[in-house]
Amino acid sequence: MSFATSTAVRPEPFVPVSVPVEDRVHAERGEFAAVLSMRHAGPSPVRLRYEWVGPANAPVVVLAGGISAHRHVASNAQFSEKGWAEELVGRGRTLDPQQLRVLAFDFIGADGALDVPIDTADQADALALVLDHLGIRALKAFVGYSYGALVGQQFAIRHRARVRQLVLASGAHRPHPYAAAWRALQRRAVELGQLQCGEDHGLALARQFAMLSYRTPEEFGERFDAAPEVINGRVRVAAEDYLDAAGAQYVARTPVTAYLRLSESIDLHRVDPAAILPPTVVVAVEGDRLVPLADLVGLVEGLGPRGSLRVLRSPYGHDAFLKETDRIDAILATAFRTSGESA
């Protein structure tokens, strides 16, 4: 073990991005029906949706994010809308689609059509079916953030011959009880909204609670330190506009069933780190309220000589992977270079 410190959900609303001619590479999006043997629900019909960008014969890297992520990671010539990892994938980045084939998929259940318990093992098996469908024997790497990191762990355990290395950010081998309690209360907010015939209101409130767990008190202190206002006889604090917007945006793109089942899926996750055999870089964020540094240290210790730890200090907490893109890119570059040297 080594240590180092470094200082789906429906797609987002369409935001076109201009792609320079010299940066245009081929991308393809598809879907197919399958029957998946699910851990808690048995054989279940599913639709698997994927998108890849890059040369068809290039090494393949899977990129998987949180439960709000989806198959469209970045704008490209075929699909010009902004992706959820727009600043991480592109020309000159480690995840350069001119050099690598970057593949992402919609998590099963993200469309709201699957109302059963979903395990991270099910997601890993779904990815294996996508690889079979595309004729991909093995991955150069699996890069996972948050929920995607959990899926990456399961994929390495259940399909160990199909991935060469892992880079896992903000996702431990088990959920922390504090974070699980946060999510349980968020699900109760949704259920309360359903009882009152206002499930969208419940989902918006759950998302607002989640934003407090994704970010840090330091960031809120810097951004929302203005004095409260009295509006129509009610006191309104500075952060409420931000939270209201976050809730409304999430409701617009997320089925309630998808949120509930994928939130549960995080809390179902349990793996033995010793069963993860590929070399693994674990990225932790000091101040992450959902995945504490100590839990990721425990994951790396369980990995033994196959694991290494990188620690980021960031005011963005759990969202650092999405906000600190230059630093994440540098970690990916080192991880890929080290893997190539040891091959």
Question: Predicted segment positions?
Answer:
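Conserved strand-to-loop "acid loop" that flanks and positions the catalytic carboxylate
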Residues: V282-G287
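Flexible "cap/lid" loop of the alpha/beta hydrolase fold
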Residues: V167-Q196
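Conserved acidic catalytic loop of the alpha/beta-hydrolase fold
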Residues: A121-K140
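N-terminal cap/lid subdomain of alpha/beta-hydrolase-fold enzymes
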Residues: E51-A110
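Conserved alpha/beta-hydrolase "acid-adjacent" motif
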Residues: R289-D295
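Conserved hydrolase catalytic core segment
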Residues: L139-P177
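Catalytic active-site module of serine/aspartate enzymes centered on a nucleophile-bearing elbow/loop
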Residues: G298, R306-A343
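Alpha/beta-hydrolase
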Residues: D23, R187-P278
